[in-house]
Amino acid sequence: MQNKFLICDDCQAVNCKSLERKLKKLDPEAEIEIGCQSYCGPGRRKTFAFVNNRPLAALTEDELMEKVEKQLQKPRDPEEEERLRKRNEERKRRKEEQDRKLKEKLAKRKQTKA
């Protein structure tokens, strides 16, 4: 089964370019998805990546890579990965819904002020 890494290009603590290079070096065959992962709270303070739908975070990129290596050595459970994938999708959906509502609210405020 191919590994999958999800990394954020928006969070303050994540250096997307260097993290992507390190992950590619670790597993050249892995799928890497870059974009908002709706993991903003931890992403402000720690660098993180989702490894096969499991979130991993650390204070430094090197510490994170150690955790990623350990995670890749563990046996994979397809049912658990599917459960985590669904949870991640739901988290992203909720964030998108919140963002949409906030934009609508701001647009209404602009209309009432005009």
UniProtKB/Swiss-Prot annotation:
The keyword Zinc does not apply. Residues 67-114 are annotated as: Disordered. InterPro entries: DUF1450 (IPR009910), UPF0741 (IPR020880). Keywords: Coiled coil. Residues 67-105 have a biased composition (Basic and acidic residues). Residues 78-114 form a coiled coil. HAMAP family: UPF0741 (MF_01863). Belongs to the UPF0741 family. This is UPF0741 protein Sca_0247.
